[in-house]
Amino acid sequence: MKRLIPVVSALALIAGTASAENIKVGVSPGEHAEIMEEVAKIAEPMGLNIDVVEFSDYVVPNQALADGDIEANSFQHEPYLDNQVNDRGFALVPVATTITTPMGVYSDSITDMEAFPEGGSMGIPNDPTNGGRALLVLQSLGLITLAEGTGLVPTVLDIVENPKDIRFRELDAAQLPRSLADLDAALINTNYAIASGLNPKEDSIAMESADNPYVNIIVVREGDEEQPWVQPLIDAYHSPEIKAFIDEKYHGTVLTSW
């Protein structure tokens, strides 16, 4: 009988690991990474082991998902995904909404938008959807006027009024916090602001309205929507514990969608 014990133990171990799902979820730095680490804790007792994979930019997570290097990602809003699908042909689909993170205006040299100097430099993200989002924020603040009919993806070429003669510098979104010393102001996505040590509520000089179309999403490969790990991932993310974590940690600068 003693000889059977290791065999039985091994079989038990195999059965245990077979019943658990193991997935990799791609995230960007800041709140997306921080929240997903908490989601992983909630998901583990549900039989889902999440390996959180952090990417430093907005381009690689979708490529990694399309290539099969990860099973899901959680870092982008739907307008960005739509642009990526159209431009790069990714077969990726959203399966759940997560959070909304209003974009903020930050500056090392001024404390309100009225003080923005004539001919000053303004940093905006260089990807179409977040760059367009930044321009829409500036229009809502009265600094520029955009041509009608540009939707959610206007470019600097669509600016029809620029009374302060703002000089736009289009930079990688992750680089904008590090470039503040060289700019009069910049529009920065909340995840990169938080990752760089900025507090959106205290350090921004203006914020995008919370009523915006840029709710973030969990994305999987087309055809994986019914995989057995998808619903536990969503349930863990949409749990009361995660909602409480977000409310307590971000104090209103990150908003839940559920």
Where are the predicted features?
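Ligand-binding "clamshell"
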Residues: 83-95, 108-110, 182, 187, ...
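A conserved helix-loop-strand patch within extracytoplasmic ligand-binding domains
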Residues: 95-144, 243
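Beta->alpha turn/N-cap motifs
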Residues: 30, 54-58, 68, 73-82, ...
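Short, well-ordered beta-strand elements
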Residues: 21-30, 48-54, 121-122
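Short helix-initiation/N-cap motifs at beta->coil->alpha
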Residues: 53-63, 150-178
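Pocket-flanking alpha-helical
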Residues: 58-89, 104-106, 111, 131, ...
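Periplasmic-binding protein-like
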Residues: 97-106, 130-139, 194-258
